């Protein structure tokens, strides 16, 4: 949470999103609205492109829903909405899908970027492939045969 807050603080202090370009952490910034169809993506860094396999031009202007799929936990997404509205921040894990529709477990922290009046201008999401962190390589979800 502290890293995400530090990045958001740099943006609030007037830094351009470009200060995040060379960051090794995967970062996505969306609009500040939470209403449907959801906040549109306004910035991603190279680490996020590598994580999800989508190039920046395909991500910008769409919503994070493009990374969700059949087995994405809808209850966790509902918790995300509730916590952002109630507390203005969120930490959790969820199953996402890369461009090839391969599953990966995403650990993410979402914090606000506020304007001078204190209103939420954007949401900054710091994202980690949880299985990669554990195994040291690109994590894949392995489902047991039934």
Regions from the language model: what does each represent?
Residues 70-95, 100-102:
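Terminal output helix/cap of sensory domains in signal transduction proteins
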Residues 1-38, 120-146:
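PAS-family sensory modules
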Residues 60-71:
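PAS-family sensory/regulatory domains
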Residues 32-34, 93, 95-101, 108-111, 114-115, 126:
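PAS-family sensory domains
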Residues 103, 119-120:
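Glycine-rich acetyl-CoA-binding "A-motif" of GNAT/NAT acetyltransferases
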Residues 48-59:
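PAS/PAS-like sensory domain cap-loop motif
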